[in-house]
Amino acid sequence: MLYPQEFDVIVVGGGHAGTEAALAAARMGCATLLLTHNIETLGQMSCNPSIGGIGKGHLVKEIDALGGAMALATDEAGIQFRILNGSKGPAVRATRAQADRVLYKAAIRRRLENQPRLWLFQQAVDDLIVEGDRVIGAVTQVGVRFRSKAVVLTAGTFLDGRIHVGLQNYAAGRAGDPPAQSLSARLKELQLPQGRLKTGTPPRIDGRTIDFERLLEQPGDADPVPVFSYMGDAAMHPRQLPCWITHTSERTHEIIRSGFDRSPMFTGVIEGVGPRYCPSIEDKVNRFADKTSHQIFLEPEGLSTHEFYPNGISTSLPFDIQLAALRSMSGLEQAHILRPGYAIEYDYFDPRGLKSSFETKAIGGLFFAGQINGTTGYEEAAAQGLFAGVNAARQVQELDAWLPRRDQAYLGVLVDDLITKGVTEPYRMFTSRAEFRLQLREDNADLRLTDAGREMGLVDDERWAAFNRKRDAVSRETERLKSTWVNAALLPAADAERLVGKALEHEYALVDLLRRPGVDFDAVAEVAQIAHARRSEGRQADDPAAAAWSRAALRNEWGPALADAVIQQLETATKYAGYIDKQNEQVERAAQYEDLKLPESLDYRQVAALSHEVRQKLQALRPETLGQAARVSGVTPAAISLLLIHLKKGRHRGFGADAAEPGSAAA
């Protein structure tokens, strides 16, 4: 039957990509339908019970800055929070949280059910309705036909998924859920370029059978307790739990090697390529044969369960090998496995077949997001989902696509990498992928993106007001640092050496003192207080606010979360100003031709002196801008120069020399 209501946007899949896509489209005013095979699994954490990490935490902050759900849901469900790389520079510091699976799923579902203009429907999707070269809806497994103006497909590992445990395998989307075989077959009929990838998960352990006295405890950060969302607070967190650390041994590795002859990975049963940076334990033992031990983290799955996730031993080995290997580790000698580990193979579609908006080049109105694009990880999926949901909504609203730049967001890096380079293995985000990472920090994601989110309708009034309070506070305190001067005579040498490293030779602005190595905001605030007190001796204080300027005073005025965020922003922006300025210059130089639009009808075979390889690649991929063309694998700077000359000379019909000038086109 044809459902009587037509929707603006249909989202297929209720995982991390699908939920963010549906919420984004609905926030932007589109009538949105989320189709899922099971409403009870909306927002389910199918693998590890954690959110964030290096590069990944940056994506979560960006999702949050755009009004997404992942960060707030993590704050409500997180049972341990840590800052990774805390001793390193601000660009690579990242938040990571262990999450209670039940609480996280409930937090996501609550947002879905209370989001205006968003409808849910429980049915697997078997087919897409396509007219000509455009999608106009979806068909469920019982034949209900839903019409829409755009469809966002976020099928995860369900497309022709197959689970492997040893040499046994069966069709599944994940453990306990059926695969989407009909939909996968339909997509292949549409001649979309596809391949196979694989990922895996470890066995789960009953915590009552773990000897914790033999393990190393790993607590979360306590002072201060991190939060993920710019709207979050540590008071939102439930009860906190520690993680625990054990190690594999040479005996463990012997057991694992003994199962290689029954491993689907080593016997050629699995054809899909797995994630390089999250290898299975059998892959680690094989590739790093010289290592006698690997660290394993035992992570609690939640407050209402005894289940533990042993991070570091993802495996598809036979169950008897899994059990023996686990029981060879310290503290796990009596371990009982609740769920076996497994690998899953699934279809993905080459992301080079997508436009910059994540709309497929072959089928108008059809957008892909998440693991279907060859990525791995909850955070990468959620970021793509939000991006695809935004652009599906903007297409419905007859607006240009939103395309964040590489220097603007990790989301921009993610999208650009996928559509220009494609994937040969599951793609995950790292800070090293971003050439402008000093600008793309966790602490300033809101300053980079919330304005754009508000303009697109993603950011509500409450978040917008909170953002403006922070932005105004940063501006005010930055000005105070620049305009407050300290005379050397007003700061005793002993205090100067204690606070800023050495006695002052002359008058300094506080901002210059803050730039010194080892000097933080608390130190310069105390400098200001001492100087103010000495200046005011014997007369009435000329500026009571200056006398009280301190972290404690700002916390009292704004609350701890905002005060600490503002201070962090001040310290980073001040100390790294020179580096940031240099990076801004690089951005400006790169932007000279980055956004130059390439004509859709450009024939690369007519560009003089291009190599056959470069012509083939550009003709096949058809990048949308010169910047994208420059990042295609095998395309050299010399090739880009030849292409630019071709465009400037107006050799492409309808593309005059004026069109190739810098700034003449915007992405």
From Swiss-Prot:
Binding residue positions for FAD: G13, G14, G15, H16, A17, G18
Superkingdom of origin organism: Bacteria
One GO BP annotation of this record: tRNA methylation
Cofactor: FAD
Binding site for NAD(+): 274-288
Annotated GO CC locations: cytosol
Keyword hit for Ligase: no
Gene Ontology molecular function, alphabetical: flavin adenine dinucleotide binding
Location within or outside the cell: Cytoplasm
InterPro entries assigned: FAD/NAD-bd_sf, GIDA_C_N, MnmG, MnmG-rel, MnmG-rel_CS, MnmG_C, MnmG_C_subdom, MnmG_C_subdom_sf
Family annotation (Pfam families): GIDA, GIDA_C_1st, SAM_GIDA_C
Function (record text): NAD-binding protein involved in the addition of a carboxymethylaminomethyl (cmnm) group at the wobble position (U34) of certain tRNAs, forming tRNA-cmnm(5)s(2)U34.
Quaternary assembly: Homodimer. Heterotetramer of two MnmE and two MnmG subunits.
Family note: Belongs to the MnmG family.
Protein name: tRNA uridine 5-carboxymethylaminomethyl modification enzyme MnmG
Source species: Methylibium petroleiphilum (strain ATCC BAA-1232 / LMG 22953 / PM1)
